[in-house]
């Protein structure tokens, strides 16, 4: 089993994916952004390997205008060396990667121009996977598309246009149920017709269930039959509904108890689970730690090291409770740890607590800082106290000091990344 996350990474410096406005998309600018994005991807792949994450969805924005005539660069050849290097890391790390083209990639549109662009976009995604040198177990996820007044005709049109795709794209394509138009049963019928895999999404299913009924367990088992050996391990999507938000809105983090209940009822606990959640890799590690076959206290201590100053600035009481919790090296209190962390992040930020946490972080530098750096810190602190400055300003200085003084421990701290 692998538990993964999508596109962006929280807490790893310089992993943002950049974009380009069309009016600025010169060859020079495109090359600059592609180079940056590939460097960011490599950092995220390195992070995944270091943290045992073997399932990852790459951003479709990796190559700006990758399927458009706006980008006429021979980017596969120009960046071949870095693609090869990243692909080698992915394969050696037993990582499975995927793409999920966006809402404008619609294969069943009645508009031929839209379909033509969709075919080009799917070919672009396939080309990126080809550049990485990964096999057909690394997939491209797509929704069916629109209904256009006639669902049966729309499904037929998808099937017809599927045959127009290059064989390499057909071999990678998998179809997901959505939260409005095509339910689990309809997607399953289509994928059986095309002999390609079906991806079950639990939240979409909860919002848009088929009239025939059936719980998650039933439809996951049904979808499993569409996955052949050549496709790799069955993959599903898992997310939780954000309270008070529109149906389908994802939570900030995965509530572990709810996930554990879902996981425990799976017939096959070895399937791959792609999390769709706002805190990305943080929830992936949370769920990994809860389901690992080798529960070691060091796993929790490692994660606590990243969270602790972010927790301290919200609740010193919870900070102390977690320190006490982890003192017992004979237990593995994964659920209690994350329950306490989630409780801390649900609390309002208190200026006094934030000042205390900043002082702890400043303590890493005060023996090395120059007089100018010390004066700047004291000025930022005074401004924050009298409401003429912000906590963000103080944190920016502390982050720059962490970079200057090579404090890798602090650079990995979620104190700088979570609000």
Where are these regions (language model features)?
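Residue-level marker for buried hydrophobic side chains located in beta-strands
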Residues: 97, 173, 198-201
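Short hydrophobic/aromatic-enriched beta-strand-loop microsegments
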Residues: 195-202, 292-297
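Conserved protein kinase catalytic core
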Residues: 106, 149, 182, 207, ...
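Eukaryote-skewed repeat-based solenoidal scaffolds used as protein-protein interaction platforms
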Residues: 124-193, 203
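Polytopic alpha-helical membrane-helix bundles and their juxtamembrane interface segments
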Residues: 152-156, 177, 181-185, 200, ...
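Alpha/beta catalytic barrel-like cores
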Residues: 1-95, 105-108, 113-118, 127-134, ...
């Amino acid at each position: 089993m692998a538990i993964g996350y999508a596109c962006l990474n929280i807490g790893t410096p310089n992993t943002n994916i950049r974009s380009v406005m069309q009016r600025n998309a010169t060859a020079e600018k495109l090359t600059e952004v592609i180079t940056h994005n590939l460097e960011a991807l490599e950092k995220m792949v390195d992070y995944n390997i270091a943290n045992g994450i073997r399932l990852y969805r790459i951003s479709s924005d990796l190559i700006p205008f990758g399927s458009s005539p706006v980008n006429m660069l021979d980017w596969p050849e120009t960046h071949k060396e870095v693609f090869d290097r990243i692909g080698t890391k992915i394969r050696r790390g037993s990582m499975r990667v995927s793409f999920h083209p966006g809402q404008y990639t619609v294969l069943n549109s009645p508009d031929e121009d839209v379909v033509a662009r969709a075919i080009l976009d799917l070919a672009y995604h396939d080309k990126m996977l080809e550049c990485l040198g990964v096999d057909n177990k690394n997939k491209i996820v797509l929704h069916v598309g629109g209904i256009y007044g006639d669902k049966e005709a729309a499904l037929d049109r998808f099937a017809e246009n599927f045959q127009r795709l290059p064989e390499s794209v057909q071999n990678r394509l998998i179809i997901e149920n959505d939260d409005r138009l095509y339910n689990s049963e309809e997607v399953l019928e289509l994928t059986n017709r095309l002999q390609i895999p079906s991806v079950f999404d639990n939240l979409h299913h909860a919002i848009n269930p088929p009239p025939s009924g059936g719980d998650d367990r039933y439809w996951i088992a049904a979808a499993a039959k569409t996955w052949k050996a050549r496709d790799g391990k069955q993959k599903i999507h898992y997310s939780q509904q954000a309270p008070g938000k529109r149906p389908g809105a994802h939570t900030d983090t995965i509530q572990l108890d709810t996930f554990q209940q879902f996981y425990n009822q799976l017939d096959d606990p070895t399937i791959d689970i792609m999390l769709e959640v706002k805190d990305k890799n943080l929830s992936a590690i949370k769920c990994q730690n809860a389901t690992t076959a080798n529960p070691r206290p060091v796993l929790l201590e490692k994660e606590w090291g990243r969270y602790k100053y972010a927790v301290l600035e919200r609740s010193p009481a919870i900070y102390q409770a977690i320190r006490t919790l982890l003192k017992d090296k004979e237990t593995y209190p994964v659920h209690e740890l994350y329950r306490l962390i989630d409780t801390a992040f649900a609390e309002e930020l208190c200026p006094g607590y934030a000042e205390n946490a900043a002082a702890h972080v400043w303590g890493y530098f005060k023996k090395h800082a120059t007089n100018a750096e010390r004066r700047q810190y004291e000025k930022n602190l005074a401004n924050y106290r009298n409401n003429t400055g912000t906590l963000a300003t103080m944190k920016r200085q502390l982050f720059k000091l962490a970079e200057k003084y090579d404090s890798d421990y602090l650079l990995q701290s979620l104190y700088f990344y979570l609000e």
